[in-house]
Amino acid sequence: MKRLIILLFICSITFGQTYPSGQNYPPPTDLITVPTAATLMRGSFSLGMRIQDGGGMILGLRAGITDRFQFGLSYGSPNLIGDDSLRWYPRPEANLKYMLIDESISSPGVAIGLNTQGFGNFNQGDSLNRYDMKAYGFYLSASKNWKTSLGNLGLHSGVSYNFTETDDGDEDPNLFFGMDIELNPEFSVLMEYNAALNENNMTTETLAISRGGYLNAAFRWTFVEHLHLELNFNNLLFDEDKVDYFKREIKIIYIEYF
């Protein structure tokens, strides 16, 4: 019950606010799972709801403390919707980001951050203590954007190190890449690749559901100024010996001002 109250409290804070006129719309801070170098503007916040396969749900709240620094928390369950015994993730997870270098015409923006929220089931058996898809952990990300005839085109890359999910014996740093392109003011296409270099030793390969990293794609629809609706196609490089198909998820992002 305490955990359910946490989720309801996050919702009540978020949807009880109003959006001031004349403000610029904050840039997206993530692709599908990959963090970009962008941060929420000061005084803005976002509520994200990720609906996973198996009835799982992750709810996250993030706030722009300054124009460079954002802070957030997330919490959820791998099987919130369904008829089997309800399981919660073991703890709320943190999301911090600070923009080190502003993007310019000739150079990308650079940010450092911490994201401890993984995806899928949380595996506690055999003292693994990790998500199906590990969190990014501590990361350094870079982003560069250009204007095209269709809209914005963004390229993103970064390196990360997960220090909270190492009981499986794989402590390697990781790499990630991504891009987003606007088709019109409402629709965007997102692509990303998580190399999953911290899931490729002999022990973790038996757990990994990907084959050579995670390739994800998504369509994002901004049908009103405050709201993104996203259809995700995750793990397109799935291991056919372990899973039958790639993952389909829905993500809803609501952005507002204090």
Language-model-derived ranges and their functions:
Residues 1, 154, 165-167:
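C-terminal intrinsically disordered extensions
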Residues 17-153, 160-164, 180-258:
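Transmembrane beta-barrel domains of Gram-negative outer membranes and organellar outer membranes
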Residues 3-14:
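Sec-dependent N-terminal signal peptides
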